Amino acid sequence: STNGGIKKELILPENLDKYALKVKRGQTQSEDMRNLGAYIKDVISLNKDNYIICGPDEALSNRLNHVFEATTRKWNTKIIKQDELLGRNGRVIDSILSEHACEGMLEGYLLTGRHGFIHSYEAFVRIIDSMVSQHAKWIKMAKEIPWRKELSSLNILLTSHCWQQDHNGFTHQDPGFINHLLPKKSDTIRIYLPFDTNTLISTFDHISRTKNYINLVVASKHM
């Protein structure tokens, strides 16, 4: 199973224009991550049993609200009426406050040949620095072994607070994860800094199609 044994090809939306934000200069206000959520919602709908979203209780904070129109948070124990957006078959792994656990679950899922991404805050993702380094090494070695199948890339989506200094600025601003990845080989690591909704959606669509990479995307979630 850990060599793409349950591999299912990822189906992606065909028409990106459907998600494009029509901008009027000086008039349009919108949130990039919220708009990306509409695209990811459709990815979930097209891949109901081979796609997961991992993150430490941040899906709504990161403005992925539209995703919950197509799925729920994964929850295997008792559900009470006060619980929000929980379900047995949810595709969002969002109910555990551990970047380590979320990244580890995603890595294992990718190894089976399936697909997904992890999202977090730019400052908090530093917790998984060493895990991502080890995965980069694994990708390098796997490329040198003929019988190793290509697998979906490890896609990391981070939100930056650099545009809102007054809100958690001291603790939430740390571009160190980019610094951590930059020295690594370019045939394994890719870093993207989309500057608006349309470039973010196009970037996410692109990285979702890649194999055997670690793709880092840093985006704004504020209006």
In which residue ranges do the predicted regions lie?
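Thiamine diphosphate
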Residues: 1-223
